[in-house]
């Protein structure tokens, strides 16, 4: 059976739709709370920064699970990892469905996140190992499109359910998906590949990333203790990186980062993902907090720009094959900076149609950045390091999303608290806070443009 699967035979093709459904479920669960943060903050009487742990905490656990997935696939096999992922999605959704308070809701989200980390890594590994080489790129693009579809559909569906049925009902959807996947997978999914052994060390990732995103989220509200926590998080992550370099069988092999071309390419991917995921949270907060829209309408306004991002991902891959990274990625960051600047100007008026259009421009720019930067970064390495580099990329995407979300929502939350304490109306405080976050985002996009120009120019000169 192994030979047949590696040749991309009927058995592998029969299992691919089920695994793509796993990718959809993972991405749907990942972004389902982006639209619900204001309601959660109001319901439980917590700040936006605290409510945002439903997103940032999710990313921390997902990043750890991605790093852990390679070990589990070797040790337990695909079928067992599939059941662990589905079980985590079902258990986490069940906890959140009946959560009586914020902390039980957060616990449910953290359990859900195990599913996202395991599925993202497992599906990519399955495609890389079992697709016919001539079809591998198509299958990877199909998986990326499935993930993008989940991210685009989730805000609309979640907003509709949240508006019509309330917060508890929101978690019935991923629970039903998990049960359906478990039932189908029990009969359809077959084991793939030999099993092995290895060591695992995820605790330092959880502690380091947790401290890092907490410090970023609170530093604008309570600077001194938050800076101490932030420094502790950086120190723990540094210890984790050192351990991965000296361990015989590391949880995450970081040696590809010794290649400067790969490291800078990954930096561009992370900067792009910080902007992309943060927009997916900040725009609903603006629509709901500053303009008073329902969660459903906020999700519907976000869906078009996110779909534009998914389409530009595909276009970006084709343009990369034709042109290379120059001038594609610098143009992408330029579009992103332009779109963010127009969003900031239009939001203060407010000019809703222009905000939506400009956010679509920013998302299109990000689509021209992330996938081409990832492909270019991987191409700087020998094939023997592709698997390790792919794990690094997947983990870094979750880390960047957590850092970006924590930073921007932390700024917005601090501004809303400060504004309302000065007597500003809640909507005006949200408007001012959103403008502040856009200024920071524009600065990051401009700095990213400069880095991408230097990187693309260097690669172009090397190729002659």
PLM features: residue spans?
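Short, Lys/Arg-rich, polar N-terminal cytosolic tail immediately upstream
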Residues: 1-9
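Short, charged juxtamembrane terminal tails flanking transmembrane helices
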Residues: 3, 461-464
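12-transmembrane solute porter fold
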Residues: 11-28, 33-37, 44-92, 104, ...
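Membrane-embedded alpha-helical segments in integral membrane proteins
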Residues: 30, 34-38, 91-97, 147-163, ...
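Membrane-embedded alpha-helical core segments of multi-pass
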Residues: 65, 118-119, 144, 150-154, ...
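Hydrophobic transmembrane-helix bundles of small-molecule transporters
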Residues: 159, 163-268
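Transmembrane alpha-helical segments of integral membrane proteins
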Residues: 185, 417-422
């Amino acid at each position: 059976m192994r030979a047949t699967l590696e040749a991309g035979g009927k058995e592998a093709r029969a299992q691919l739709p089920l695994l793509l459904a796993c990718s959809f479920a993972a991405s749907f669960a990942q972004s389902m709370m982006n639209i619900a943060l204001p309601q959660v903050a109001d319901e439980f009487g917590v700040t936006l920064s605290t409510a945002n742990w439903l997103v940032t905490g999710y990313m921390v656990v997902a990043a750890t699970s991605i790093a852990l997935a390679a070990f589990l696939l070797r040790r337990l096999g695909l079928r067992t990892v599939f059941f662990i992922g589905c079980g985590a999605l079902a258990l986490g959704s069940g906890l959140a469905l009946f959560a009586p308070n914020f902390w039980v809701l957060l616990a449910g989200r953290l359990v859900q996140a195990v599913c996202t980390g395991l599925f993202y890594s497992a599906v990519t590994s399955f495609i890389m190992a079992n697709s016919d080489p001539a079809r591998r790129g198509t299958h990877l693009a199909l998986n990326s499109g499935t993930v993008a579809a989940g991210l685009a559909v989730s805000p609309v569906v979640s907003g509709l359910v949240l508006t019509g049925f309330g917060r508890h009902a929101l978690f019935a959807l991923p629970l039903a998906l998990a049960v359906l996947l478990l039932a189908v997978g029990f009969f359809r999914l077959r084991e793939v590949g030999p099993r092995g052994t290895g060591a695992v060390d995820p605790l330092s990732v959880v502690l380091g990333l947790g401290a890092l995103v907490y410090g970023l989220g609170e530093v604008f509200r309570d600077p001194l203790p938050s800076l101490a926590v932030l420094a502790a998080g950086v120190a723990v992550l540094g210890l984790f990186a050192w351990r991965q370099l000296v361990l015989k069988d590391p949880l995450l092999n970081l040696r590809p980062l010794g290649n400067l071309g790969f490291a800078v390419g990954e930096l561009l991917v992370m900067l792009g993902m910080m902007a992309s995921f943060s927009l997916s949270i900040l725009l609903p907060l603006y629509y709901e907090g500053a303009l008073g829209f329902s969660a459903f309408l906020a999700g519907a306004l976000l869906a078009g720009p996110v779909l534009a991002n998914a389409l530009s991902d595909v276009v970006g891959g084709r343009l990369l094959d034709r042109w290379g990274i120059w001038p594609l990625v610098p143009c992408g960051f330029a579009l992103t900076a332009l779109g963010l600047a127009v969003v900031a100007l239009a939001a203060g008026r407010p000019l809703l149609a222009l905000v939506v259009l400009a956010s679509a421009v920013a998302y299109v720019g990000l689509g021209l950045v992330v996938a081409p930067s990832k492909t270019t970064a991987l191409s700087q390495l020998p094939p023997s390091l592709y698997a390790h580099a792919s794990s690094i990329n997947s983990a870094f995407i979750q880390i960047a999303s957590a850092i970006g979300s924590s930073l921007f929502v932390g700024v917005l939350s601090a501004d809303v608290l400060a504004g309302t304490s000065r007597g500003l109306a809640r909507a005006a405080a949200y408007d001012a806070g959103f403008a502040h976050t856009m200024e920071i985002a524009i600065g990051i996009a401009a700095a990213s443009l400069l880095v991408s120009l230097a990187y693309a120019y260097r690669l172009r000169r090397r190729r002659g």
